[in-house]
Swiss-Prot record:
SUPFAM superfamilies: L domain-like. Residues 21-50 form the LRRNT domain. The lineage of its organism: Eukaryota, Metazoa, Chordata, Cephalochordata, Leptocardii. InterPro entries: Cys-rich_flank_reg_C (IPR000483), Leu-rich_rpt (IPR001611), Leu-rich_rpt_typical-subtyp (IPR003591), LRR_dom_sf (IPR032675), LRRNT (IPR000372). SMART domains: LRR_TYP, LRRCT, LRRNT. This is Leucine-rich repeat-containing protein Bf66946. It is found in: Cell membrane.
Length: 265
């Protein structure tokens, strides 16, 4: 085979266009069979649903994506790298990465995140440790709200974390902490008030204190169930009392008839 033919063959193998690629993306397969799905700078407002399951690297930077749900990466178990930098993400479900056991890094820098759940990274971190790999998260240049929800990350950074980068990790709120690095702030400064309302890691409206406990919707359901049960019991008791009272009245009526006209009873 001529040198020219070898060159053309290698070029074809390193840039194979995949038929099942989302319309807003470009899919290529490397010489080693690793698929790269590039959807950067396409004005996307959400993650495409038809990303090929064999994708290894997913590039979604420079778009207008606002949230990551628990189903955003469903079926994409082969992902090793995700680039979501420079979007408008303000909410990430704590279950978004729950199936990504091969993930090496995720870039969430330059978004609009004010808080992030520690649970979000549990599965990728534990999987990386079990496989002897390194897992890294880029979180720089987000408007962090330095309250109780971010205490865990501040503690990680202060301890010299090898998973979370500490560059450009400054507080945006509250005003007293604005501009200060998370790793420099004492744990006692990360406090919440009952008036602070926000979306928790699963998208349920709750106060920061409630975000670490049971979701508000769950509590409301429990209270509603208790009230419904109590009302049902009261209705049953009332029905039983009315039935008993009716039996007594009927018994008295028949007794009276017996006394007056025993021959007709």
């Amino acid at each position: 085979m001529a040198l020219r033919d070898i060159f053309l063959l290698s070029m074809a193998m390193t840039a194979v266009t995949v038929q099942a690629c989302p319309s807003a993306c470009k899919c290529t397969v490397s010489l080693y069979g690793e698929m790269v799905v590039a959807c950067g700078g396409m004005g996307l407002t959400e993650i495409p649903e038809d990303i090929p399951h064999r994708a290894v690297y997913l590039v979604l930077k420079d778009n207008n994506i606002t949230k990551i749900t628990s189903y955003s990466f469903k079926g994409l178990r082969n992902l090793q790298g995700i680039d979501l930098s420079n979007n408008k993400i303000n909410h990430i479900s704590s279950a978004a990465l729950r199936h990504l056991g091969h993930l090496d890094d995720i870039d969430l820098s330059r978004n609009e995140l004010t808080s992030v759940s520690e649970k979000l990274f549990d599965f990728p971190i534990s999987s990386a440790k079990a496989q002897g790999r390194r897992f890294f998260v880029y979180l720089a240049n987000n408007p962090w709200g330095c309250d109780c929800r971010m205490a865990w990350l501040a503690q990680e950074l202060a301890g010299g974390s090898k998973t979370f980068g500490d560059r450009h990790m400054e507080c945006a709120t509250p005003a007293a902490l604005a501009g200060r690095g998370l790793s420099e702030i004492p744990q006692t400064s990360f406090v919440c008030t009952g008036r602070d309302i926000s979306f928790d890691s699963d998208g349920i409206i709750a106060t920061p204190e409630e975000s670490t406990a049971f979701p508000v919707a769950y509590k409301v359901a429990v209270v509603f169930g208790c009230i419904t049960g109590l009302v049902t019991i009261l209705l049953l008791v009332l029905t039983a009392m009315l039935y008993q009272k009716r039996r007594i009245r009927l018994g008295s009526k028949y007794e009276l008839r017996w006394n007056k006209h025993p021959e007709f009873v």
